[in-house]
Amino acid sequence: MSELSEQCEKRLKILLTNDDGIFAPGMTLLVSNLLKADFADLYIVAPKTEQSAKSMAMTFHEPVILQPYDYPLPVAGAWSVSGTPVDCVRIALAYLFKDELPDLVLSGINRGSNAGRHVFYSGTLGAAIESTLCGVPAVALSQEGNFSFFQEKNFDIPEMLKSLSLYALSLPFAPHPVALNVNFPASNERWKGMRFVTTGPEYSCGVPHFLFCDGDSKIFKLSGGPKIVEEIPSEEWQTLRASYIAVSPVMATTSPLATFSLEEFEQLQVGFYDFANSLGMEN
């Protein structure tokens, strides 16, 4: 029996986290859809406050507080953490669940795209990458613009999340851990399907805006600016613009030589499209 078949037959243990905070609407949407799918016991360990754009930052110079959280939906357990998304993952895996690690970590659903160069800044991605470094497969989930995708009824959202979770467990984990970065498009068109693509170079974050002077101090605010797009847009960019879900592998490694060969990437694509076709989705 294959490892994926075994995963399909057992009830999973899934850790949920995010960077928008444990109270965020995206977490509520994720939990409610996973509860409908009813294939896993859900545990939430998420920031007590907004932690967007924290990437893989950790809290070193002050205590981090872990508190039980009375989550409004029937999860197996929930805790808030007074720190970053990576703090949440490290505390969950090294303390709360050290004797029985989760099968999978789902990070999100982030309000806003984490495509392109946003992967370097995103706390949603930071949590997923940290999880893979700790030996647990992970998926980062982000919705561009708003959460309209999860109100659409043109296909079964709970079943899609279940299948995506099982697919993530089938990815090759050695010699370099791989997280999945999933971005849902913002469009008034009907959602068409999924595409497995490489991460593009587009970005729009961290533009400094001068606000005012306070004595000798100058006050700035960093916020998103216009999207910077290449002359020939990336496949990831075009995928989202065409109302497809963009799924990209993110490797958790420091080696510049640790990339997929074209043949390896194409093999991953074939496996992914077999999965997408099983859901009746276009690609």
UniProtKB/Swiss-Prot annotation:
This is 5'-nucleotidase SurE 2. Belongs to the SurE nucleotidase family. A divalent metal cation binds at residues 19-20, 52, 110. GO terms for molecular function: 3'-nucleotidase activity; 5'-nucleotidase activity; exopolyphosphatase activity; metal ion binding; nucleotide binding. Its cofactor is a divalent metal cation. It catalyses: a ribonucleoside 5'-phosphate + H2O = a ribonucleoside + phosphate. It is found in: Cytoplasm. It comes from Chlamydia caviae (strain ATCC VR-813 / DSM 19441 / 03DC25 / GPIC) (Chlamydophila caviae). GO terms for cellular component: cytoplasm.
